[in-house]
């Protein structure tokens, strides 16, 4: 038996130098967050680093002083040679590129801001929301609106994820909330070579706890980019979606406990280097059908990455509005994923809650054990979705 790690990255949206650097910074953030999210033998990981970084990018636009520097360092912009004044233009270029992207796959990314109706935003922050992010502005009453305010936000998320995520928030929000910065992303891709449903059969999947489970497993003769790396103890296959601009890249460790070891040691540079070495060939692929649904409160995990000041009483978001001491109370993130014979469907939504401070030879590639995954655009290299499956 071999432990599997599947890295899926769903997108890369960069044409200019700053965008290339933003992609590098976002991919570093993706791997860092993967390292810091807790797992167990019976739980899985799935998140959209792209969704999280865009939502917090809006917070960066309104942050000032040490709070802005905290986000700047936490997202690794200096390590990627991005100047402070280049960050927002890089996001603006990403947004324009994303909306103009033509593909055989469906990729919808939406940005929004739910704002308390009595809050007067600075014109400079409104300009950033409109011009850099193309955000939808949702006016709500967080103080008296109760469930009505939640319904507005959940309705927006439901529409933008095509019904895959119904509830970002389950009930009425605190009355001290003044705005919620939102991102929603939806992906649907058809395999370049669709798996024949008639060949799907029950096969054992070795869970991380070493308990096998019979799961529906697809089988197909597929042309993929593939290579084995014996010295690293990993087998990699990149399964393309129709149009070849998106792919699911699967890293399959040779050891049954290899997923955790691989997760601890993978870097964005290593992933990129390994993918570059893959060679196209026909492979007999065995891939389980599976669904994932996850929800995270990211405050503690972001703090581990050095992003602290946005949450404290000393947070400085004076670039958003005058006359209110604002701080982030938490970052809510939800994702869903379904992998089946026809392809993949995934969605993610993020809400940054800001409150008024008081808080060739045919090869067999058998995916039959725990794995980590990214979905990515093969041209742009941005990581949009990351996950780790330990239990089916």
Curated annotation (Swiss-Prot):
Regions that span the bilayer: none
Entry keyword Transmembrane: no
Tissues expressing this chain: Female salivary gland.
Keywords: Glycoprotein, Protease inhibitor, Secreted, Serine protease inhibitor, Signal
Pfam families: Serpin
A single GO molecular function term of this UniProt record: serine-type endopeptidase inhibitor activity
Superkingdom: Eukaryota
Glycosylation sites: 104, 130, 265
Main location, first listed in the record: secreted
Signal peptide: 1-16
Gene Ontology terms: cellular component: extracellular space
Compartmental location: Secreted
PROSITE patterns with a match to the protein in the record: SERPIN (PS00284)
Matches recorded under SMART domains: SERPIN
Annotated family: Belongs to the serpin family.
UniProt function note: Serpin with unknown function. Weakly inhibits human granzyme B (GZMB). Acts as a substrate for porcine elastase.
Protein name: Iripin-4
């Amino acid at each position: 038996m071999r432990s599997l790690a599947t890295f899926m990255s769903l997108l890369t949206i960069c044409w200019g130098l700053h965008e290339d650097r933003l992609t590098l910074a976002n991919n570093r953030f993706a791997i860092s967050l993967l390292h810091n999210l807790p797992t167990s033998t019976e739980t899985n990981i799935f998140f959209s680093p792209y969704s999280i970084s865009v939502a917090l990018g809006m917070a960066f636009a309104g942050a000032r002083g040490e709070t802005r520097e905290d986000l700047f360092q936490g997202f690794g912009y200096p390590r990627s040679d991005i100047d402070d004044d280049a960050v927002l233009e890089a996001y603006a270029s990403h947004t324009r590129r994303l909306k103009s992207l033509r593909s055989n796959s469906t990729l919808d990314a939406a940005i929004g801001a739910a704002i308390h109706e009595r809050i007067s935003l600075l014109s400079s922050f409104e300009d950033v929301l409109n011009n850099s992010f193309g955000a939808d502005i949702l006016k709500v009453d967080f103080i008296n609106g109760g469930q009505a305010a939640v319904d507005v936000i959940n309705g927006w998320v439901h529409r933008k994820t095509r019904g895959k995520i119904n509830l970002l928030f389950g009930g009425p929000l605190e009355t001290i909330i003044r705005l919620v910065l939102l991102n929603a992303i939806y992906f649907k891709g058809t395999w370049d070579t669709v798996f024949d449903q008639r060949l799907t059969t029950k096969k054992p999947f070795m869970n991380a706890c070493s308990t096998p489970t019979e799961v529906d497993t697809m089988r197909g003769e597929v042309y993929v980019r593939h290579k084995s790396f014996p010295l690293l103890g990993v087998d990699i296959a990149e399964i393309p979606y129709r149009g070849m601009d998106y792919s699911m890249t699967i890293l399959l460790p040779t050891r049954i406990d290899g997923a955790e070891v691989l997760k601890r040691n993978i870097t964005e540079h290593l992933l990129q280097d390994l993918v570059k070495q893959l060679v196209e060939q026909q492979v007999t692929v065995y891939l389980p059908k599976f669904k994932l649904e996850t929800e995270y409160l990211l405050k503690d995990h972001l703090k581990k990455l050095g992003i602290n000041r946005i949450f404290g009483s000393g947070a400085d978001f004076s670039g958003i509005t005058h006359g209110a001491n604002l701080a982030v109370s938490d970052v809510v993130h939800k994702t869903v994923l379904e992998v089946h014979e026809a392809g993949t469907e995934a969605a993610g939504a993020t809400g940054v809650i800001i409150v008024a401070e008081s808080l060739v030879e045919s090869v067999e590639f058998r995916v039959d054990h725990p794995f980590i995954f990214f979905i990515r655009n093969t041209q742009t290299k941005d990581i949009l979705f990351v996950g780790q499956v330990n239990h089916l």
